[in-house]
Design a protein with these regions (language model features):
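Adenosine ribonucleotide-centric catalytic and binding domains
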Residues: 34-46, 106, 117-121
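Short, well-structured alpha-helical interface segments that form or flank functional binding sites
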Residues: 14, 61, 65, 89-93
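Short catalytic/ligand-binding loop motif for oxyanion handling, primarily in non-cytosolic enzymes
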Residues: 28-29, 48, 88-93
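Cysteine-dependent PTP/DSP-like catalytic domain, specifically the C-terminal lobe
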Residues: 96, 102-133
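Catalytic cysteine-centered active loop of the rhodanese-like fold, especially the PTP/DSP P-loop
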Residues: 73-102
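Glycine-rich, flexible N-terminal cofactor/catalytic loop recognition
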Residues: 1-40
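Helix-loop module immediately N-terminal to the HCX5R catalytic loop
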Residues: 38, 43-80
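Short glycine/proline-enriched coil/turn segments at helix->beta-strand junctions
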Residues: 14-16, 33-36, 75-78, 100-104
Length: 133
């Protein structure tokens, strides 16, 4: 499930759900009580639209951390809440990757996801599969 930061901050915690919290600068105020929370920071820009050095794209390392986190919590949770500021593109990209990696439902007609974030996660997932061989 992907949503915006405001909704994630106001959502009551669910003890058998995990959270991926994506912000630009400051941490989101996620309530205590979730199974686990992974925090990461990167801007909502795609590689082709990154015009300034200060714009922080998602890195391969951040993608690997998210992939490894999802695999670590997956056996212990019944749901995953992914949020970013607007709840439109970064969180959607993560949710799309999770749905594909774990054969879960996702509206694949939804095309507003951040393509750079999605590519980074797909590549990190492939690297993980190679490490496990």
């Amino acid at each position: 499930m992907f949503t915006n930061q405001n909704t994630a901050e106001n959502n009551p915690s669910i003890e058998d759900w995990a959270v991926i919290s994506i912000t630009d600068l400051d941490d989101a105020r996620i309530k205590q009580g979730w199974y686990a929370v992974h925090r990461t920071k990167f801007c909502d820009v795609d590689m082709q639209h990154a015009e300034h050095e200060r714009e922080m794209l998602m890195t391969a390392e951040q993608a690997t951390e998210i992939v490894d986190y999802v695999y670590a919590v997956e056996p212990h949770i019944s749901g995953l809440l992914v949020h970013c500021k607007g709840g439109v593109s970064r969180s959607a990209a993560v949710s799309k990757w999770v749905a594909e990696a774990f054969n879960l439902k996702f509206n694949h007609q939804y095309n507003l996801y951040n393509q750079h974030v999605y590519r980074q996660l797909a590549e990190a997932h492939e690297r993980r599969k190679l490490r496990e061989q």
